[in-house]
Amino acid sequence: LYMDCDLVVNGDIAELFDTELGDHAIGAVPDIDFIGNLNMKNGERAQYVRKQLHMRDAYGYFQAGVLVMNLERMREIHTVHEWLEIASKPGYIYNDQDILNVECEGQVTYLDYSWNVMHNCAGRVNGVFDFAPANVYQAYMASRKAPKIVHYAGFDKPWKNPWCDFASLYWSYAQETPFVAQMVAAMSGVERPAPPEHHERAIAED
């Protein structure tokens, strides 16, 4: 399994680990943000696909923040050196995500959207996501009701903004950690105080 650091696991991760990939290289959730952008009137994302990615079916583009990886198959597609060489090429917007989509096209097992529910950053649910095909948008909206993994993709993070989408889920887990007070202090701009200096007399009396 590979997972980005800006997410919360809200379901049984063993279910994800046990995903049967067969001969496929990767298991992943379709990227509703990318797919929605394909249908935007400005045509920028569609043009990027044609000129840079050259994918046969860009609507199969997946989000690389949560991946089930068949490492044996990945090494058959490219050696580690080849993967790194490809990754060093310029011109990609989403770097590793773009490269994985291009090189693994046709080798993907698509997961239920609940395994990578991207939160509503900057109102994208009703400004980008809803431009995706109806079946894609409906599957995403259904996954929001029972997310197994919530992905805080984008600039709006619950540890910076407690009012962002799905922030309550993040903080419900944060409250179970021994450092929640420090997290709240950091979010509030409270700096850690310097350790107090011992008074000479107090030390002498010890």
Name what the model sees in each region.
Residues 1-40, 68-69, 75:
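GT-A fold catalytic core of metal-dependent nucleotide-sugar glycosyltransferases
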Residues 36-55:
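Surface-exposed acidic, glycine/proline-enriched linker/cap segments
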